[in-house]
């Protein structure tokens, strides 16, 4: 089987249809980083059945579809097609009829992948097994993607065993063994569940047998209860009728008494109405008299209030006049005060203006004295400044020399300290350097941590694989569960529909006999045609039309010879036994022949529904009757219930499988999380070991550099100390050469005293000038205040005159009002006398009206008493009548309740209860209490039976049938498990034989290839960790030229890469794969090793039929290829493929040279 072409369309960056030809020899793929070279490898693996989107560098499987670019829209599908040359007919038998196999995988966005081989849709598993049998596949070591060399180097020995399995060609056996193990596990699970169900069914059979016996006893007790209930209800109905008659007689007597009381009450009401009509006019007259009297009393009270208000007004006027006199006196005094104040302010104004003129003359002389004092002080201060400058210069020089001396002394002291510190630091570094850690031990610790890291990475890969497998198992468990639940739902819906139809047809008082018939399948039309509407009749004795049990009689004629009775195919109540025994089942042809042999009452019927009767009546088959349809539906309902039970069992099993898969996925996820946490810990340990090694190395380098710097500092400090000593001696000599500054300080002190005297004089003169200025300012402010105060007093004087005029006007008004009020008492006395006279007359009228009203109300009260008494008698009569009517209605309701209970409980009319109780007319009946006691006893007997399953016999037959079916299924499962276990053992045996046979061959090729690639040295493969080759790990022991033997992880990067390549090529020589892809495996190699690598590739291409595809950036590797494909990205986000046939170019060049 040879791969010849790979066609991509819409896969990742290859948006346009692209053909990648895979020809014999070496094919190179080159191009810049990020242009899509690795997409070719991923397309090849994807078409071989890769299921992990992570290994394809995608966020999900839809991410392999072209997602669009700046100028290209996204695609909705992607497709990769591989063409395989099958001319040697090495494909599986089902596909071995074609010379060329086109294997395609197409994915629609959000719709999943579809696999096809030569246009026929197949499973992903079929494609994976096809490539696994050919020693290749999506996870084959022959497809060496970026980082694959590193994975082989870092892999655990158990993981490297996969290389041997590919060499032995047992990958397909592993897949088949895994599938068989899954089937074995499922079969064992099903066997356990079947055995559990069989045990449950056995328990149910025992229980149903007991329930069937209870059902028979229950029916007997129920019949007695029904008869006793009928007698009890009959007695209650008879008593209720008698109670209704007695209540009716009492009610008629009450009605007559009510009529008499109604007449008496009507007469009393008439008299009451006549007397009540005279009261309104008397009440109105009394009210008018009382209103007139009240109006006069109110007038008298109003007159008193007006007189009091007049007196209060006179007192108020007197008080206000007195107040106005005080206000006028106060305003007059305020005008006098204003005149005096204005005169005082004029005098003060004149005096202040004279003082201001005197101060102006005095101020001019003081200003001249201030100018003279300032000039004298300025001359003295200038001389003081000159002397101060001279003394400061002298002092500054002295201070400078003294500071220089102090500075040099401090420098000497600091240098001495630094010299001591440098010497101490040199001694300390010598001690620390002698105690520094051994870098070799730290390097070994780094290697140990790296080995642990490699083990943890292997554990993480195993956990990821386990999680992927668990997720695949979970995904595979969902679809069967959905199908099973849909099947259960469909069967439940059909069963409910049929049950509803059957129940809707039997909603009558007596269930028809058809409900008790069970017909063998295929005989529904026959029994429906021959019995027809007779099947709708019940067997209940109380029904007006019913079947009765007369039994098969000995004198009944036998059916014609060779005719089979319908009773043999029908299970029916005994009431139908005689009828069914006289009905024969024949074919249509025989029916026509035998119809003349029928005796009285006999019938023949065909399975299609043709009927022949003894009296010559013949009915041809027609559409199924209602009874036939009903029987068919009941048969179908039974089949559905059986199917539904099995479907529920299957759904439960699949649900448990899904739950188990979910639990396995959770465990796998937890294991992956734990392994990743361990990996992170191992990485932290590696980083810590590397950091410790780097820190120790940095510390050693720092000590060496520090020692060199301290030696330089020691030499520099010695030179600086000598310079500091010389500078100190020079500064001390300069201080000795300076003259003393005593004379300059004395002259400066004399000038300072003269300046202080002149400053005091100038200050006194300035203080005198400032006092004069302040006095002038105060005088100006006082003149302004006098002007404002004069204006205020003038306003007050004008206001007082105005207020006096206003008050005098108000006094005149109040005096006039007081004069008017002086005559008010005489006027009020006259008015009061007139009102009192009118009040006396009004009181006499009111008393007369009140007396007349009281007499009328007394008579009315007596009339009301008589009317109330008659009304009470009428009310009592009505209540008595109502009670009688209520008792009569209650008796009728009780009668109706008894009749309704009879209809509900006995399902007969009340008149038929006696017949149901088998009561003979005129017979003496037992007391009601005795019947109730007997009924209670029967009911207790029925209740002691508890919940009774009336369908126990039918359920018993169904469960026994299920038990037999499951027992047969259990035997089949046991046999299948034996076959599966035998098959798994056979596969394991074959895999071990192949693996051991290929190990020696691979090991021999590996030794030879290792020596070739390294130019010497030794290497070998070892099976470790287990005696079973299927569980053992593969370890690599290598000894490059000039080194001791060591494991793969301790080699250098280039050596590891060459060793891994030797292992991969050894596998090729053992079981050559149709294709080998090497994705930048030459990246860690130097030019010399690249030459060796290319020599080996060339040799492999010649000695095997494997077709090599090499993705590289190395120009040496490019030059050794037979052909090159270039991957470019001229348009952003879109890859294009171009090819160059290097061998053809060389041939053309050779021809031109020749």
From Swiss-Prot:
GO terms for molecular function: ATP binding; ATP hydrolysis activity; DNA binding. CDD domains: ABC_SMC_barmotin. It is found in: Cytoplasm. Transmembrane segments: none annotated. Pfam families: SMC_hinge, SMC_N. ATP binds at residues 32-39. Keywords: ATP-binding, Coiled coil, Cytoplasm, DNA-binding, Nucleotide-binding. GO terms for biological process: chromosome condensation; chromosome segregation; DNA replication; sister chromatid cohesion. Gene3D superfamilies: P-loop containing nucleotide triphosphate hydrolases. Homodimer. NCBIfam families: SMC_prok_B. Required for chromosome condensation and partitioning. Contains large globular domains required for ATP hydrolysis at each terminus and a third globular domain forming a flexible hinge near the middle of the molecule. These domains are separated by coiled-coil structures. PANTHER family: STRUCTURAL MAINTENANCE OF CHROMOSOMES PROTEIN 3. This is Chromosome partition protein Smc. It comes from Rhodopseudomonas palustris (strain ATCC BAA-98 / CGA009). The lineage of its organism: Bacteria, Pseudomonadati, Pseudomonadota, Alphaproteobacteria, Hyphomicrobiales.
